[in-house]
Each structure stands twice: as C-alpha cells, then as structure tokens.
Amino acid sequence: YESHWDKEKKQPRSKSVMAFGYVHELISDEIPDPVAYYTDFVAEKNKERAAAFTEETRPRAFVAPVEYNLGQFLLYTLLEELNVKEVIDILAAQMRFQFRIYDMIAQLIFSRIIYPCSKSKTVSSVFPHLYNSSPISEDQVYDGLSFIGGSYKKYIELFNHCYEQHYQRDFSNVFFDCTNYYFEIDLPYEDKQKGPSKENRHDPIIGQALLLDADLVPVAMQMYPGNESEKPYIRKVIEEMKSRYKVSGKTVQVADKGLNCARNIYAAVKEANDGYIFSKSIHGRNLSEKEKKWLLLENEQNIWKDYRDKDGNLLYRLKSCVDSFSYQFKEIDPETGRDVVKTFSVKEKRIVSYNPALAKKQKAEIQKMADKAANYATYKAMTREDLGDSAKYVKITNKDKNGKKITPVIGIDKEKVNEDLKYAGYNLMVTSEL
C-alpha cells in the first residue's frame, strides 16, 4: 500500500500498489515462508522507489533555466568599477581551483540580494537563474569559502582600498554591532566554540562583529569565539578595527540588551569619547522602581505619541526623556588587585515604546509559561530542563517563618507573573545621541 494526503477530504488515504495473493496459495518449494519473503520484497521496492524519487526531485545546479534574473546589473557595474577581479584571481592562483573565486564571490553577492537562502539552495536554485553566470557546484562554493575564510581580512582590505579610490568615506560617525551564528562542529577549534546564543542555546556558535561608516557601508568585520562574552569583547574589537582601518571618527555602538552594561557605557562615553544606542531590559533589577514607574506614566510632563493606521487602530506608542542617569560597575584595581566599585553618570536619552500586538503575544506566552510551571506540584517532579523558560515563574520555599528548614514547597511566583504581564509590549532604548 501507498499512503498520501487527500487535500480535498483533508485526511490520509491509501491505495494498493501490488497484490500478492493469499498466504496458503503462495507457499511453494521456492517460497516456503511467503510472509518473510514478501516483507523483504516490499522493503527492497520501497528503497528503490525512494532512491528514484530522490533522484527525480534533486535540484540540478546546471540545468538550463527557463527564465533569468537581471536585477544584479547595478551591483555588477559596482563590482566592475571597484576593479578587484585581477587581485582576487592572483590571491587564489596558488589553489588551482577549477573555477574563478571572483565569479563565486560575485554570484554569492548577487544571490544574497535577489533571493537570500542557504548556500546549498543558492547553488541549485539561484545561480542557474543569474544572467551570464558561471557553472559553480555546491562543493566548489564550500571549497572557495573555506579558502577565503582563512584570510578574510585581506579581502576586506582589498575592497576597502578599491572603494576609497572612487568614493569618499565618512568617518564622522561609525556604527558597531555584533551577532552570533549556530553551526555544526565535531570538536571545538579556534574561534568555533560552544557558548550561549541569542536563543539561549549552548550549541556551537561563532561571533561576528561589524563596523559601518556614517553611510552604513561596511568598513571592517571580525569573527570571535562563541564561548566569549560579547560585553568585554566589544571594546577589544572596536579598538582593533578602528586602529587597523585608521578610523578616527566617533563610534556609535548599536547593540541589543546583551551588550548593554555599565562597563561598556563607561568605555564608550568616558574612555573613548564615543556613543551608544542600546536596548535595555525592563525586567528584574535592571531598572529601579522609579524608572519602571516612568515607563507606564502618562501626564502633562510624560506625553505619549500615538501612531495609528488608516483605520484608526493603534500601531504603537512612543515617549522619551533626557536626563542624567547613574551607573556603577566593579573592576579590579591594578595597583591593589582588589575589587573596586566605580560610579559615574551620563546624560542619556531614553525612548520607550508600546506595541499592542506585541503585548498580546507576550501576555499569551507568559500565561502559557505560568500554566506550565503550575503543573509541577512536587519538588522531585520538577527539573529545569522540563520547565525551560517557565522556571522563572516557579517559587520554591524551603524555610518557614522562623527560618527553619522544611520540605521544599513548590508554588507560582505571582509577583513575577504580574510584573511581566504589566510590562508586556514595552521596549526601552537608551542612547547618548541626544
């Protein structure tokens, strides 16, 4: 039998592909056990059919396409103007590739603009549709990327040099950001390490830092180990990239709350005379009670500006303030070797937004996590792996009113649930750029 999904009836259906007959009629000297024989027969036919289906549906990288994409001509002209082809071919000459590295780079750039997708799908589904493209296989793309990745800074310097022959760089402000990527490795190696990603996973990741000029044209890029904290690394990377590429302008660090810490703000504003645009967490102890109260406040001094669609439905709300805010952080005194607390203040603009659609989504997620946490009635039945993010709503009481140890009692942290529900839909941005 063969099963398939019936779209009209919206249910699985089966059809007979081949009938063998009754067991007692199939018994013979050649087939003493028809059940075992035809079980193996069906398994073999299924393998053949699966192999044939895979071959029929496998994307062909070099099949002549019916239509071509022409949208890359603007970028094609820019690459031709930069005149990097000859130098790139010289850099790759030692490898004796059966394809041109420049052609691979150009086609990957064009494909990223036309239809961003995985490298495998790019080769099979996008390359063939590029007008006047070169036939480059998936294996060749990975070989070429591995070669470029070993000395990627050379290529960045080449493109920077050629770009500056034609265009004036604006370094009055430069922007910095970093992110990380998940990838597959058997063992950690150099900058490929296991560490926490933005999705709170601890799978192998690698970090990437990017520096842009005032026109948002990339200046520098640097990879760093995924098991290193981004917070101290941001300072090191900015210093290295600005020094390497002779950038003297003010750097505005743009980052999410993962990089927002007092030490980075101090390094940006006080040490380097730079700026920052950070998102800031509104939960936990990141904000004082006074600051949290301001988020929800609406009066003559705290006016929200509403943005609505053409039908009058609220899309989002914004309000802002400018004030001096105090920060503090611990660092080791180089002379005594002891921890010292450094306190400083900075004039900062804070922008808070409220999105009703986001609030609805977050409230549903909070309620779902709270309900999940409520299902664990005993301490033994509860593990952090089972709870996941719901663990933050679990309250464990292991002492009585007199401070005496008791059997752990599991409960819901209603105060935490109510606080998260109250601030659902709100986001906070802080910046030195007034």
Locate the predicted segments by residue.
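Conserved glycine(s) in the ABC-transporter nucleotide-binding domain "signature"
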Residues: Y1-D103
